[in-house]
């Protein structure tokens, strides 16, 4: 199952060695897939490729999609049908992506198809607004193929993008903020972020409610 999941994350059909993204793929996407490990470092496995091919036949006979097909199949469909892709680019004038640090390659490819950088790729019928939110230091879905390098290269993909840094914590205790900051600085992205604590404490629930009301007012 993990072999099939990995192949689908990289948009690989049975027998494929590189992503089949079609003529509508953003420039350099196939090269990026190779950089990220596509084809997988351990290479195709003939016996598993046969199982994968049989699995796809059974899905087709059942008129079914599995979970990974919901994204990978959409990418293949849009890449193969430029008119359909253009219609969805017109339909979605603004796109919001939460937890961007946890997207995988197939999800990234879908975002790039629907919201290409029209300044670079000379496309004017596409999403005018793309807003993503995420933190590379909170990436937790690597076991499902996510790669925080996608959020780290966002400014490369969209060089005109504005960046808003959220540097206040409203829920963590001071000790947690301090410990997390030391860990991130020592071992992760080294982004140099300093998180400020913005957290009020109240003696009772009633006083907390009053404090919230005053803040809103």
State each model region's role:
Residues 8-11, 55, 81, 118, ...:
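Conserved NTP-handling cores and scaffolds of large molecular machines
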Residues 4, 66, 133, 176, ...:
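A residue-level signal for conserved active-site and pocket-lining positions in enzyme catalytic cores
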Residues 159-162, 167-217:
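Helicase P-loop NTPase motor core
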């Amino acid at each position: 199952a993990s072999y099939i999941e990995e192949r689908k994350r990289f948009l690989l059909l049975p027998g494929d060695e590189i992503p089949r993204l079609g003529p509508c793929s953003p420039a350099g996407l196939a090269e990026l897939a190779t950089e990220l490990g596509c084809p997988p470092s351990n290479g195709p496995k003939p016996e598993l490729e046969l199982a994968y091919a049989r699995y796809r036949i059974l899905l087709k006979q059942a008129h079914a999609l599995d979970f990974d097909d919901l994204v990978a199949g959409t990418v293949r469909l849009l890449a193969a049908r430029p008119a359909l892709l253009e219609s969805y680019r017109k339909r979605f004038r603004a796109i919001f992506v939460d937890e961007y640090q946890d997207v995988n390659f197939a999800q990234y490819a879908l975002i790039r198809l629907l919201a290409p950088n029209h300044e670079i790729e000379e496309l004017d019928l596409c999403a005018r607004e793309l807003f993503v939110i995420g933190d590379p230091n909170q990436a937790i879905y690597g076991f499902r193929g996510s790669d925080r390098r996608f959020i780290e290269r966002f400014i490369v993909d969209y060089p005109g993008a504005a960046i808003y840094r959220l540097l206040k914590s409203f829920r963590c205790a001071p000790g947690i903020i301090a410990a997390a900051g030391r860990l991130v600085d020592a071992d992760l992205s080294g982004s140099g972020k300093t998180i400020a604590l913005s957290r009020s404490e109240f003696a009772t629930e009633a006083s907390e409610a009053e404090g919230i009301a005053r803040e809103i007012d």
